[in-house]
Structure formats: C-alpha cells, structure tokens
Amino acid sequence: MGQLSSLTSVWMVVVVTSWVIIAANIDTVEARSCSECHSNATCMEDGMVTTCSCLVGFTGSGFECVDLDECAIPGAHNCSEGSSCMNTLGSYLCTCPDGFRLTPGLGCIDVDECSEPGLSRCHALATCINNKGNYSCVCPAGYRGDGQHCECSPGSCGPGLDCVPVGDALVCADPCQEHRILDEYWRSTEYGAGYTCDVGLNGWYRFTGPGGVRLAETCVPVLHCNTAAPMWLNGTHPTRDQGIVNRTACAHWRGHCCLWDASIQVKACAGGYYVYNLTETPECYLAYCTDPTSVLGTCEECSVEEDCKSHDGMWSCQCKQDFNVTDLFLLDRLECRPNDIKVSLSKCQLKSLGFEKVFMYLRDSQCSGFNERGDRDWVSVVTPARDGPCGTVMVRNETHATYSNTLYLADEIVIRDRNIKINFECSYPLDMKVSLETSLQPIVSSLNISVGGTGMFTVRMALFQTPDYTQPYQGSSVTLTTEAFLYVGTMLDGGDLSRFALLMTNCYATPSSNATDPLKYFIIQDRCPRTTDSTIQVVENGESPQGRFSVQMFRFAGNYDLVYLHCEVYLCDIINEKCKPTCSGTRFRSGGIIDQSRVLNLGPITRKNVQAVVSRAASSSLGFLKVCLPLLLSATLTLMFQ
C-alpha cells in the first residue's frame, strides 16, 4: 500500500424492469479509512480493504462525487410523454404543465378545474367551462364581465329588482335593501327659500328624517324646500304589489307646475316606506321636496300590540289599552346570539306599567337602550358575548361558558325612587369558537376572504391542546415535545354559515416564515391528508363552517431550527359545489398554484437544545433522509407565535 489509493474500474449493466436498460460507469476506490469518502458516497469495509462508492444518482471516484443529470441521459428517467424531467440533487422529478395532473400509467391528464372546489376563479354567477389544460368563465345572459368578475346591465334583472352598485360591483338587488339615504330637514315643503341644487344624484334613495319620508304629491310653491324651483311627484305613490313603477318629477317655476321634469322610478317597500330611483335635476336651482306630514308615519307599521288611532286629524300607531302586566320579568326577550346577547322589552307593556319614558342601560352605562320596530315596538340593549364589554361577566366550566349582566330600567334620567334591575345570562356549549373567545390570549391567526357577490368573511386558525378542540393554547409561546400532538382548528367567523363550508385545500409546514418556501411538508394536499404520515388525522374538512386536523410534532431534517404552519382555505358553496373531499389511495400533486391570499399562517416553532438533539440523532441513525419526517427521538420544542 505504497500509494494513497488504487483505482479499479468495473463495467456493470443495471436492468430496470418494465422501463429501461442503462449502462453506468461505477467507480470503486480503495481508501485507508471511511473518512476519506465523499459525503455522497458509501463506505464498505471488507477485512483489510476499505472502498468508497458514489451513491445512486451520483458519479465520480468515491473521493469526489458529482450529481448525475438523469434528465440529460436518454433512458435514465421514466418521465412520460407530456411531462417534464427536472433534475435534483441525486435524483429527478417528473412534473406536469399547469392544468395537468401526473397519474401513474397515464402520464399528465387534464385537471377539470370546474368540478374540483377551489381550482377555478369564476364569479359565483358565471358558468365554468373546462378546456384542455385550462378553463374559461362566462357571465350569464344580461351580465357583462370577463367571467371572473360579472356585473349586471340595466334591464337585465327580474321583477322588483334593479341593477344597483353593491361594493365595487353592479348586482341585481332589491332597492328596498340597497339604497342611499337623504335625510336633510330642509327638504320639507314647509321650509323656506334657498339655493340648493340636487346635482350628482343618481341611483336609489330613501327619504328619512324630520323633513318627511316621501316626495310631495302636489305642486309645491316656489322658493320652498331650500331651493328656487321645488320638484314634486306628478302622480301617486305605488302599492307594494305594483313593484317598480315609472313616474315623472316636476319642477315648479314662473307659474308652471311642470316647467322642467325628470323621469324617476318608485317602489313601495315592506314597512311603509318608499325608495326612489332619482336623477340629477335638469337645471339649477332645483331640489326634490318631501311632504312633512309623512314623517308622522302610517298605520302600515303598527305592531300586534298597537291600534291605528287618529289624533288631531293624524293617524298613528298607539298602544292598545287592554294590557294587564304585573310581572316585569315576563316582558323581556332574551336572544343568545353567536356574537352578542340582546335583551328587548316591549314599549307598550312598559307603558302599561307607568313607564312613559324609558332609560335602559347595562352595568356599563355606556351600553344603553335603543328603539327598534319589528313584530312589536321594542326598546333593546346589546352586549358582546365576551368577558368585559358592557360589564358582562363570563364564568366557564368544563362544558359551558356563561355570560351574565344586569339591565337597569328607569323612567327618568335622574333616579330617585324607581330603579328596576333585571339579571340575565346566556350559556354557550364550549366549541372551538367559544373556547377562543373565552381564552385570555389565544394563539390564533385570521384572514379576510372576499366571496363574489356575498361580501367579506373572516376565517381563523388556532392551536388547541386537546382532541376535543376546546382548550386553545394561550400566551405568546407554548412548550411541547415531539411525542405530543398538535390540534389545529380553522373556523368561519360570521357570514352566511348555512351556505358555505370551510374547505382546507392545502395545509403544510415550512422551515421559514415564507409560505412560498419550496421546502414544504404537506399535512393536507389537494384537500386530502398525507397518507405516508400515520400521525395525521383530519377530523373535519369541507363539511361545515369549521375544519379540524391533528399531527404529531416534528422538525425538518437538516440545519433548520424553525417550523411554520400554513393553511390554504376555500369557502365552498354547499348548494352549487361538492365540498367534502373524496380521499382514497395514493395522492399525487396536481401542480396547482397555492393562492397566498387564502393562506393562514402560524409560527415559528422553535426547537430548544438544538445541539443535543442533533448529536443524539447522529449517533442513533446511519442515514438521515433529506426530507421532512417526524423525529424519532424525544425533544422539547418551544412554539412562539407571531
């Protein structure tokens, strides 16, 4: 052994069954010790001989090993026609173009973005058309747009509806619900002269306030309504069954009650009010005028506790006289709603007890009562279903969170001898949402998602300690071992919970805060859990407004000390889409792009005693795969979440 080493070249033939036969020049080098072998080589000791051989996917002497580009060698890879070969260190990947999915035995097949939830970006009203490698969106008849954004056009809506602006889009809606308010007191026909001109008006409006709640139906004298030439409705107001009607608004000037005119539309709404589709006045100074007598209301709004009675020639709703209420605790209506608690008292029943005026407030007097009309004339007060606001107190046990407060009732601002207290409480069974709200500092991430034609929704993701998802981690950090399980919950907060299900499309971990980091460990991919990790359990996904999964704690192999969690979510329309994933067999990457605007982020997860963990791992394992795997050794992890 006078030389450093001796080189022996051996020609070998490697047969890959059913695929290719390739020849490779594998070099074996005799060495003095295994320390001389390259990091991408194996060392074999056979008696007195120590040899170094490059790993599969590498070529060289054993002292030096370089990556073998399988993509550049004909027959060295098994990527099918239509797919692309991408060389990696020691191996290669077969990838498909966007819009295709790699399937064993079939190669790259087209992905039907229209049938799989979360893949298309079509507007809620648009029709999705699948094409080879892509898809297209087409707005419905009467709508305009590129399919991802659809807007109605005038005259395209059904009876009683109109094309109105909602947010930054035009949609078919009921103008009784979608309108703007004109509440100027000077619009009253009893107000004097002025120089107001209604320029810039365009769309549906409702008149409110002390000036009147509907347009005047008779010719208004000039120099009234704070303008020179008052505008009035030349015709009668419609009834509710007539829907939207066309009318003419006239302007009075120089002895002509209709010297100028403008075409408008009117609709009668439930509740006894009207909405008007107005245009700006044809000249200045002209303004729309309201009838001041209409502010007194009509008997169309009377509740079951009221009669329509005349007083000084004016008809109005007045409380019936047959009330005989002695127990105030029978008056309250308590509503335990998801986000708040509402207590309502009947004004007519309070009046029968002698309360001509009602001053109502909670423990925190800033939370005071307000009037509202529904099936009755109510005075109500609302407190958030949280500990603290309005003086609300929360008590929690193993199964429920109970919120309590006290309602104070007086008939004068200055209380002398009549002060009534009503204690009330609401109990909520503990679930993910209630548990988060009852925790002091839950570890949670949230994001707002916009749904076309529906509005903004808030989705939250939180970390829980137990499999019943009722005990969230609190504070800024938490300590776990890799033997422990982490329970992750996502939930839709508010919005139309009856229409949408929350679908977790991709949930994964990265070693950096960058959610687009190419090194990802998928927990859920393409809506289905990773089948090669037996610690992953998806409890709920695409079935309700919440999602839940659990996974055993892990770290990334290599020089990574941090782990971040990310979850891409999608609001699935349960009426028009199939939301619950169907998961069976081996799952393959679809090559779809993750929409970062729909990703929730939590992290980082920081390991303690890094050096000790690394040394133990090196002594107990001959090889460490360069992929993200759960740790086999027990180690302490500290989670510090932004």
Swiss-Prot record:
Pro-peptide positions on chain: 621-642
Keyword Nucleus tagged: no
Region annotated ZP-N, chain positions: 335-430
Organism of origin: Canis lupus familiaris (Dog)
Stretch list, region Essential for cleavage by HPN: 587-590
Residue ranges of the region described as D10C: 174-293
Cystine residue pairs: C34-C43, C37-C52, C54-C65, C71-C85, C79-C94, C96-C108, C114-C128, C122-C137, C139-C150, C152-C163, C157-C172, C176-C269, C197-C284, C219-C257, C225-C289, C250-C258, C299-C308, C302-C317, C319-C348, C336-C426, C367-C390, C507-C567, C528-C583, C572-C579
GO terms of biological process kind: antibacterial innate immune response; defense response to Gram-negative bacterium; neutrophil migration
Localization: Apical cell membrane; Basolateral cell membrane; Cell projection, Cilium membrane
Region feature Flexible ZP-N/ZP-C linker, mapped onto this chain: 431-454
Full protein name: Uromodulin
Key words of the record: Cell membrane, Cell projection, Disulfide bond, EGF-like domain, Glycoprotein, GPI-anchor, Immunity, Innate immunity, Lipoprotein, Membrane, Repeat, Secreted, Signal
One term under GO cellular component: cilium
